[in-house]
Amino acid sequence: MEQYNALLRYVFQVTEQELSSIGWQEREIIRAKFPTMEKADVIGWFDDDTLVSQVAVYPMEVRIFGKTYAMGGLTGVGTYPEYSNMGLMHRLLEQALKNMKKKGQHICYLYPYSIPYYRRKGWEIISDKISYEIKDYQLPKNRQVPGDVRRVKTDSEELKETYERYAMHTHGAVLRDELAWNEYWLWDSDDVMAAVYYNEKNEPDGYVIYWIANDVFHIKDMIFNNEDARTGLWNFVSAHFSMIDRVEGDTYTDEPLAFLLEDASIKEVISPYFMGRIVDFEAFVEEYPFRPSVLDREWKFTLMDPVMECNQGSFLLTISRDGHGEAKRIMEPCRDRISIQTMTTMLMGYKRPEYLAKIGRIQASEWTIDMLEDAIEQQTPYISDYF
């Protein structure tokens, strides 16, 4: 564990000063990470007794268009510079993906330190983060709602229940067990607080996780199941008007905040957040909920994958009228072509087939693109986790 932590700190240049700024000491990190690492699949290369390259995969679950998938959360990726360009990481990633395949983890998420690098290995962007800044005078005015907001402890069951209710109907969301919650809070300071919106039936319908420092109200995340919850939570934020100069926060949906505000001239910055990768295409499609149709549908194409052999070659994708998909390998050349990166971002709903064809990421007929547009749900992933 000490070598794992030392390698990550060296590669990502984490200093003692940076650790102490959020209240961490070296030994505390090791203790905090130990329960998570016990459940993780950690593999590495050693030079004698020295760990020189490593990856870790957390066993997780995610919701994809109403279905629960086992997911491998890739993290802890690092190689000492003197051991780079030896192919060590490529082989570790290949082994990690093979291990995921054996465990039935048909999709992999990661937070990238280098988008180009992971694209070369088969991952693609699947979600965004919108960072915003709202001046105190731009905050929404109080509006009456049937529920109320109560502050709770960040480790409370109320907070976990609120997230679970939200995640179960939210495409892309990680279903958080203790491992996922531990990772979610790991790098936050002790000043982080939480408030939950309860509806008129006393059910939790949303929360805001925040901290206040130097006259700034920082929002780590805000989730809500309906408009009443959204309004109630912003009422709570606006109630801090006399204490703050501005609000800074992040949101992980594809809906910019500006349109919802009376004074919409706020600062918003959209940036890529998580990347994803289909691990086993045939198995992924077997569980995937396509849209129903009055007709059966099919598509023959060549799939390209830079790492996983099981995803390389020609396939026939059939989609039944009730939306059940099946992918089978075929032994014939196909004119249509798509990479595993593009297949992932398309089936996850981050980018639409028509757009991907327009920019040359899919080679297929207009009829096929129209069929895919009709077959794939229109919803972009929400991912607010970090691991």
Model-derived features: positions:
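A short, internal acetyl-CoA/4′-phosphopantetheine-binding micro-motif in the GNAT/acyltransferase core
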Residues: L74-S84, V216-E227
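Short hydrophobic/aromatic beta-strand element in the GNAT-like acyltransferase core
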Residues: A40-G44, Q54, G76, V192-V196, ...
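Active-site/acyl-donor-binding loops of N-acyltransferases
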Residues: W123-N142, N226-F387
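Conserved acetyl-CoA pyrophosphate-binding loop and the N-cap/start of the following alpha-helix
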Residues: Y83-Q95, D228-G232
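Conserved GNAT acetyl-CoA-binding A-motif
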Residues: L93, K98-P112, S242-Y252
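Amide-forming acyltransferase catalytic core, primarily the GNAT-like/NAT-type
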Residues: D128-K220, E227-T231, N235-H240, P272, ...
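Short amphipathic alpha-helix that is part of the acyltransferase structural core
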Residues: M1-P59, G66, G73, P140-L179, ...
